[in-house]
């Protein structure tokens, strides 16, 4: 529809996973990775917090699937390849009409070390530094050569010598997952050592920001893994700002499509006018809110905004899915199936009788057996209705679409489950109105 192109990774017969893993995301060219990165407020906040003249560690806080690893990979590339990052910021500055983007200062003097800690490559954090810092081998020798005076963890003096030799940005993904899994007994007090060592790193990052930039990710702030860093008042990126919802929509569109930003507002408005007009009439939107509703539809295209909200705020929460990550998979599968055929994609396009429509991707995200069984019940209802009118001339217009929309809306939280006839009517309306 309107020449919209899915990214290559979503065009194969088998839909690939959408998870960004820090270790693999840092292996390719910076320009290629930044090409699939939308400059959300959280991305920009992270890059700014790691910039010159800043003096606080950075903590990315959020549950799985919210994009922490993607942001860390973007920061890694921004620190490692200033030219590519500056070009990326300049390009988006023009696209978004925000001159401040291209003025965002970037560090260009840091040795960047990144590690996905959940891969369990290292038992101790200092081993990462000793193994991968240019001055690490020398500093390991100092520490291990202290004999009876050797401390349980390397001292701040040893670390300061290392970072003075070569200023460093240390990017630690899945820090909480790693920390919580550490042994902590009298014989093997590894978690206590990690707790002490992260305190030393945090204090160096605060007191000597020209020597160390520390960036870690955690799932939540109520863990010991976070407490020592919290003491030095870090910059917290938590995906909850006032722009978060709008940014998430833009991120979804940019991650899914190569050219969504190039489709004009006039083209979209013309394409979806019939559907939006009927939606406004059926839902009885007040006149004062109608322009706002039309803007919402235009911004969310090719998806209906109420469908995105339904998936994001109700279904994925109710089914304990991994938020943005699973939403990308679901929408990619859905667009591949119906995107070229309908002016706007609604809940009615989650066809219960067609596995290509994104149903499988959605069910893969469902943790609750009750939700998984709802599709079986919906299919039985579909067959029952068809059987009831078999052998008669009674038409059943839009039957599959109506039951599909009702099924999807029934996956929502109990207090929000189901739909009235006007909502279902709006869901099945395409480029022409349907008689009430």
What are these regions (language model features)?
Residues 1-66, 73, 79, 233-263:
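Walker A/P-loop-proximal flanking segment of P-loop NTPase domains
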Residues 2, 14-21, 48, 54, ...:
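Phosphate-handling catalytic cores of nucleic-acid transaction enzymes
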Residues 27, 109-151, 174-188:
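Conserved P-loop NTPase mechanochemical-coupling segment
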Residues 76-111, 139-153, 432-436:
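Flexible phosphate/Mg2+-sensing switch loops adjacent to catalytic phosphate-binding sites
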Residues 100-123, 200-342:
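Conserved P-loop NTPase catalytic core
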Residues 138-176, 182-183, 192-204, 208:
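Mid-core helix/loop region of P-loop NTP-binding domains shared across ATPases and GTPases
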Residues 182-185, 278-399, 412-423, 427-435:
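C-terminal helical "lid" subdomain and adjoining coupling/linker elements of P-loop NTPases
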Residues 210-226, 230, 415-436:
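Extended, well-ordered alpha-helical scaffold/bundle regions in very large, multi-domain proteins
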